[in-house]
Design a protein with these regions (language model features):
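N-terminal intrinsically disordered, cationic/polar leader segments
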Residues: 1-30, 45-125
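Short, conserved glycine- and acidic-residue-centered signature motifs
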Residues: 32-36
């Protein structure tokens, strides 16, 4: 089971932590884990390379935990509102995509020990 916890401050998403293994298939062959990893790196690269924002990320393969946070989503740290909206929009879009997948989880054959869940933690940066 993978848990994706989104970090939010004053209603603005600024990061997330992914932990665990979806267990839809064997480690290394799981399309859901591959999707989560791909979207995660897309978000990191977009913040750094496209929007010129500040992003920190940590990948702990031993514990299967990935943490991504960006101050550029928050008005206290980023003056350019276009960057703020773009960065926070990436996090919000990821959240909504996962939320939508959970609404249609009958399309996937998860066992009781596999799948994913999403949470939101209101936490200052």
């Amino acid at each position: 089971m993978t848990t994706i916890t989104f970090f939010r401050s004053d209603g603005i998403f600024y990061g997330f932590e992914e932990s665990g293994h979806v267990a839809y298939a064997e480690y290394g062959n799981d399309p859901f884990c591959a999707m989560l990893s791909s979207v995660t790196m897309y978000i990191v690269d977009a913040i750094e390379e496209v929007y010129g924002g500040n992003v920190s990320y940590d990948i702990n393969e031993d514990d299967t935990v990935i943490t991504v946070r960006s101050r550029s989503a928050l008005p206290a740290y980023e003056a350019d509102e276009r960057v703020r909206f773009a960065v926070s929009g990436l996090f919000l879009t990821y959240y909504r995509m996962l939320e939508d997948m959970l609404l249609h989880d009958d399309m996937y054959e998860f066992t009781k020990d596999s799948g994913f869940q999403i949470k939101v933690k209101d936490l200052d940066f």
